[in-house]
């Protein structure tokens, strides 16, 4: 069985801003999945949505009534236990992602790929609830993104001292 990454574009703003958005998303998801041999044969659905859709998902499933950059919904706690082979779904909000990228001085493409990697790691059981877990997750994100030629998303911006 082969691994699948299904990308659903609900908000065309994604393709207007990044014409190669599907390739960017697939590349980031695949980079994480390639580093985890134990999940071969499982699939992920990635929804590129608008802020309203992500706000609805966040409200309905997490009881938080606001749009957020990325949501991850694992299918089960152990991917091997899922008979259909899906490890979960990810949803990304265009407006939130675009604003964050601009605020952080990053390209939308790089920010999107970081958030996809972050979301896939959540599906695989990574978390950032405490400092040790956050450090481990961020280290893995840095490693994955470096392989995609994306700068460290957690690096402090260079100061403009003069």
Swiss-Prot record:
Enzyme Commission designation: 3.1.-.-
PANTHER family the record matches: ENDORIBONUCLEASE YBEY, CHLOROPLASTIC (PTHR46986:SF1)
Main location: cytoplasm
Primary role: Single strand-specific metallo-endoribonuclease involved in late-stage 70S ribosome quality control and in maturation of the 3' terminus of the 16S rRNA.
Family: Belongs to the endoribonuclease YbeY family.
Gene Ontology BP annotations: rRNA processing
Domain of life: Bacteria
Gene Ontology molecular function terms on file: metalloendopeptidase activity; RNA endonuclease activity; zinc ion binding
Pfam family, any one: YbeY
Keywords: Cytoplasm, Endonuclease, Hydrolase, Metal-binding, Nuclease, Ribosome biogenesis, rRNA processing, Zinc
Protein name per Swiss-Prot or TrEMBL: Endoribonuclease YbeY
Organism: Caulobacter sp. (strain K31)
Cofactor annotation comment: Binds 1 zinc ion.
Enzyme class: hydrolase
GO cellular component labels: cytoplasm
Subcellular location: Cytoplasm
InterPro entries, sorted: MetalPrtase_cat_dom_sf_prd, YbeY, YbeY_CS
Cofactors (names): Zn(2+)
Encoding gene (name): ybeY
């Amino acid at each position: 069985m082969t691994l699948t990454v299904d990308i659903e574009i609900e908000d065309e703003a994604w393709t207007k801003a990044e014409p190669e958005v599907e390739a960017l998303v697939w590349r980031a998801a695949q980079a994480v999945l390639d580093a985890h041999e134990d999940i071969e044969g499982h699939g992920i659905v990635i929804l590129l949505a608008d802020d309203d859709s992500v706000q609805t998902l966040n409200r309905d499933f997490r009881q938080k009534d606001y749009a957020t950059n990325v949501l991850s919904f694992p299918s089960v706690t152990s991917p091997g236990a899922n008979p259909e082979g899906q490890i979960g779904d990810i949803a990304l909000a265009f407006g939130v992602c675009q604003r964050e990228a601009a605020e952080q001085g990053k390209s939308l493409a790089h920010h999107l790929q970081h958030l996809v990697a972050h979301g896939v790691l959540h599906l695989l059981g990574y978390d950032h609830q405490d400092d040790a877990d956050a450090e481990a997750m961020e280290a893995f994100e840095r490693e994955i993104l470096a392989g995609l030629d994306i700068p460290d998303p957690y690096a402090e911006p260079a100061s403009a001292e003069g």
